[in-house]
């Protein structure tokens, strides 16, 4: 059986209720620029929701770049993550980061979140 690296609708948090549930007693992994909040879900796979506030990232093309990089990184690492719902909160300082830097930071946060969930 081959591993699929697609990013389908079922891998996303879609409704406000799904987002809200993650904010109640989450497992956290954070850096100065990004915070990951997670709770266990009843699915067989992880799901992700992204929030990039205009307050921190003013221009739409910058917000889109950040979301695209995080989504792509999640798509590549989804099979290493447990069945959890994750909300990614982006804060100040991400705009100045290069794409490669952002990729490394997000990978580090996935590992940190995985350790906190499993241990």
Curated annotation (Swiss-Prot):
Query: Which GO cellular component terms, listed alphabetically, does the Swiss-Prot or TrEMBL entry include?
Result: ribonuclease P complex
* An example molecular function term from Gene Ontology annotations: ribonuclease P activity
Superkingdom is Bacteria
Q: What class of enzyme is it?
A: hydrolase
Q: Does the keyword 4Fe-4S apply?
A: no
Q: Which UniProt keywords apply?
A: Endonuclease, Hydrolase, Nuclease, RNA-binding, tRNA processing
Which Enzyme Commission number(s) are listed? 3.1.26.5
Key word Zinc-finger present:
no
Q: Name one GO biological process term.
A: tRNA 5'-leader removal
Q: Which reaction does it catalyse?
A: Endonucleolytic cleavage of RNA, removing 5'-extranucleotides from tRNA precursor
| Matches recorded under InterPro entries | Ribosomal_Su5_D2-typ_SF, Ribsml_uS5_D2-typ_fold_subgr, RNase_P, RNase_P_CS
| UniProt-listed PANTHER family | RIBONUCLEASE P PROTEIN COMPONENT
Function noted in UniProt: RNaseP catalyzes the removal of the 5'-leader sequence from pre-tRNA to produce the mature 5'-terminus. It can also cleave other RNA substrates such as 4.5S RNA. The protein component plays an auxiliary but essential role in vivo by binding to the 5'-leader sequence and broadening the substrate specificity of the ribozyme.
Q: Which HAMAP family does the entry mention?
A: RNase_P
Q: Which family does it belong to?
A: Belongs to the RnpA family.
Q: Could you describe the subunit structure of this protein?
A: Consists of a catalytic RNA component (M1 or rnpB) and a protein subunit.
| Protein's name in the database | Ribonuclease P protein component
Q: Give the species.
A: Shewanella woodyi (strain ATCC 51908 / MS32)
């Amino acid at each position: 059986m081959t591993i699929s690296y697609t990013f389908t609708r079922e891998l996303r948090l879609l409704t406000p209720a799904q987002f809200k549930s993650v904010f109640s007693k989450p497992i956290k992994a954070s850096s100065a620029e990004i915070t990951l909040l997670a709770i266990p879900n009843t699915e067989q796979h992880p799901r992700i929701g992204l929030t990039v506030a205009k307050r921190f990232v003013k221009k739409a093309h910058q917000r889109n770049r950040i979301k695209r990089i995080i989504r792509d990184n999640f798509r590549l690492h989804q099979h290493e993550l447990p069945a959890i719902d994750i909300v990614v909160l982006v804060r100040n300082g991400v705009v100045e980061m290069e794409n490669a830097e952002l990729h490394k930071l997000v990978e580090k946060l996935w590992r940190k979140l995985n350790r906190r969930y499993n241990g």
